[in-house]
């Protein structure tokens, strides 16, 4: 499956994440809050909360922050109700884009997302216009470092992974959404740490874009990722060689 090129430069990726760490933690905290309100504060009985906590750990969110978010959502301190919405549309060159939002104000979110699409040379479409181009999959990204490829591959496949890929700096483990938690926990039990661990939408194919369109599309991505309501942005753009997304 495509969509993994962003891991070609681990240090650049980590640097970008460090710069946005506060915003990333806030967004993950919102996911934790929604998970607790839906299924309670007990990790063992709430798979959505387990997934959110795994995502938090992969982003190096301190355990104190994680526990504080869980306690706040479980108590009376957080009365905000968030709605989950997925917006779909197109970027430059017909790139397919899906935007996952958690919001307490649909009108605000719709306006902000539409504006980001327009400013980035694209347009927001109707529900379902690009969703069929993606598959929902669990994805676990592990930095290679000194790890043995065959050993990690066997661990992943034995745990129930669908696919294992070795890229320049990372191993990428792909699972079905249903098996994601089981595979993630099996790899965690082996002492592995993750750069990323989440259920996401992965494109079936990629759309190549030139440098001019890449600049426009990067503007769209930056606007969306800076929006407090936007949790995730998925797309099928293939950036030009050497482009640092």
Curated annotation (Swiss-Prot):
Citing just one GO molecular function, the answer is: DNA binding
InterPro entries per record: Integrase-like_N (IPR017856), TACO1_YebC-like_2nd/3rd_dom (IPR048300), TACO1_YebC_N (IPR049083), Transcrip_reg_TACO1-like (IPR002876), Transcrip_reg_TACO1-like_dom3 (IPR026564), YebC-like (IPR029072)
Q: Which biological process, per GO, is one annotated for this protein?
A: regulation of DNA-templated transcription
What top-level branch of life does the organism fall under? Bacteria
Localization terms from the record: Cytoplasm
User: Which keywords does this chain's UniProt record carry?
Assistant: Cytoplasm, DNA-binding, Transcription, Transcription regulation
Give the matching SUPFAM superfamilies. YebC-like
Annotated Gene Ontology cellular component terms = cytosol
Q: Which PANTHER family match?
A: TRANSCRIPTIONAL REGULATORY PROTEIN YEBC-RELATED, TRANSLATIONAL ACTIVATOR OF CYTOCHROME C OXIDASE 1
Q: Which family does it belong to?
A: Belongs to the TACO1 family.
Put simply, this protein is called: Probable transcriptional regulatory protein CPE1954
